[in-house]
Structures are given as structure tokens and as C-alpha cells.
Amino acid sequence: MDIPPAIAAIAPDGRLTPAQRRRILIDLCRRRIRPGTGSGSGFSQRRTALNPWPDLRPVLRGIPWAIVGAVATRAYMPERATKDLDILIRREDGDEVRERLEAAGYRYVSRLAVPGFLAQSPEGVEVDVVLGDYPWLEEALTRLRQDPAGYPVLALPYLVLMKMESSRGRDLGDLTTMLGLASEEELAQVREVVARYAPEEAEDLESLIYLGQVEMEKVPLAEDRTDAEG
């Protein structure tokens, strides 16, 4: 496949950094977004735990850990389908976590592309164990939230940091939805954490908040404001 001109202008070889991917997707959204999600407001506010996932709380008791990735988003937006469970632990706990999982019947499958490993539950569920060394990790592991099933998940500011660093298409979709649904108090917490740990991402964060609020019809598009004023 030929590299599209808009991509080639930024990265002639087509190899975009996460920040470049994020900026392109934000620009696309700015041009194409329209208010409304296609779902009723009641659905947008619904928080469920309909998809069953392995309960690792008894297995990892005493070890700090949190659910991240797609499953974690159900604490902040409507639940969406995903094929695996991602958890985040401290790098130094990796060996003990693997030993405990294997003792509980989990099977080690392979290493991940990032530091960590893939395990499979006795029921065949894939669990990605991410070994974290983020500068904010210790802080985040003391400020966990609970999802609708009572499982520990990263608080919104740290989940935002992880998804901004990854910046895949589905991550940007999750970000605009979660930020669009967040309260002003939650957004203040996100801004504060991003300002401390990733100040270079502050401009993109504001764009994602704006896009999310337009999607949730919390703010009108600039063109709509102009029409109303005219």
C-alpha cells in the first residue's frame, strides 16, 4: 500500500511516532466530528461489568496491581468488547506475579512487545501482564478506583497518560469518550497529573477534552456558535 500524502509529509517512511499518530487523528476528528454519540444519554452514563473476567484479587493479594487497557475503561464509559484483560504491576513484582499465576493454574504463553508477559487462565482467557516503570506508577497504585465489578482499575488521570502514550486509533476513541463524560472535577485532576508527568501533552489533552465534549454535546462546535450568533 502506498503511503498517503498526508502521512508521507510527516514521516516519509510511514513510521509515525505515537505523538504523530495522535496529532493526525486529532486533526481528522476536528475536521469531521459532529455532536452526538448515536446513543441516548442514559446509555452514555451507564457503567456495567457484563463481560466476565478472571478475578485476580485473591491470586495477587498483597501485590499492588491494577486493570488497565480496554477493560479499565468501563469504570469511566460504557463497557466495550475486548478479547483480553490487561493488568499493570511494578516491574520488580514480575517474577512473583508469574509464580502466583502459575500456582493458580495460569499458563505462561509468551513475552509481550512491551515489558511483560502473556498468560492464559484455566478457562482460556488471555491476560496481558504489563511490567511498569512509569514515573507515576507508585502514585497511581495508591489511588486506584474500582470498576462496576469491584476490580481495581487505574484512576482516570493515569489511564489517560497510558492511552496518550500508546495513541492507537482505539486509544484516541477511548480518550475522547472518557474525557467527554468526565466531570469538571475529574478533568481538573487529569490536567494536574498530565501537567506534572507529561506537560508536553497538555495541548493535545485540551483538544481531546474539547472533542469529547462536542461528541457528548456538552459544548457546541465553533461553526454552530457562529450560526447562532449570526
Please report, for each region that a protein language model flagged, where it lies by residue.
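Compositionally biased terminal segments of proteins
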Residues: 1-230
